């Protein structure tokens, strides 16, 4: 068999340089010397007969060839990690690692409950939770870096033939108001009342905002006419802003359980409008599925439904 033109260690070095932007920082992150990093890069460039890095500027940037190699290198390294986890499963079915992905709201307010149930049943299995945008989570599932994910948005179009999407539960969305707002005296408001509110909104690219806009549009309510007081990228920041009487907001009902119990926020229903989004389980059927992932899916997800949140008052 001919010698391979590069090693796994060399791929890790190239990945570190791309992430850190310099040979020295890459060396520090890998706990090896800078000359060792330089030598490994020179060796792989010599073996492949291509230049992988542009060393002309202050930052070490990948060339087109470097980007191409790293794209395949990420897949190779992910497959190696997958292999190790499969062997770990084979050695002992009661141990291992479960890597879960979730979009922002789901990861913050739902996943801790699910992970707690799983850890009580399987304390030997280590759980890693990755919280990111729906798009990034789906790509990590596709690449084998995440075992199983729960998302509240749609899978990217380019991944729909690769990933398996299973409906899981409904996530009700709530219109929240400061308790001092005149509308807080009502359990239900009219559609026209929305145009009188000042809104604290999630960024336009957020899943919840897209879902709310689409549902409202179906009821002939046009969010483009809303007065947006400010945009924030954090549900916690939005809740704080609403409590500070800066405006109203749409959030997941799962995020306001404590605030409703303590009377810190008011949940106003909109007449004849139901605000729900679908939560889905995302897996990659073409990747190895660990025993830990099977247990989480079959024993935890199958038996647990997110608790229903009710407006107080």
UniProtKB/Swiss-Prot annotation:
Keywords: Chloroplast, DNA-binding, Plastid, Transcription, Transcription regulation. GO terms for cellular component: chloroplast. InterPro entries: LysR_subst-bd (IPR005119), Tscrpt_reg_HTH_LysR (IPR000847), WH-like_DNA-bd_sf (IPR036388), WH_DNA-bd_sf (IPR036390). It comes from the Eukaryota. It is found in: Plastid, Chloroplast. Residues 6-63 form the HTH lysR-type domain. GO terms for molecular function: DNA-binding transcription factor activity; transcription cis-regulatory region binding. Residues 23-42 bind DNA. Trans-acting transcriptional regulator of RuBisCO genes (rbcL and rbcS) expression. Belongs to the LysR transcriptional regulatory family. PANTHER family: HTH-TYPE TRANSCRIPTIONAL REGULATOR, HTH-TYPE TRANSCRIPTIONAL REGULATOR CYSL. This is Probable RuBisCO transcriptional regulator. The gene is rbcR.
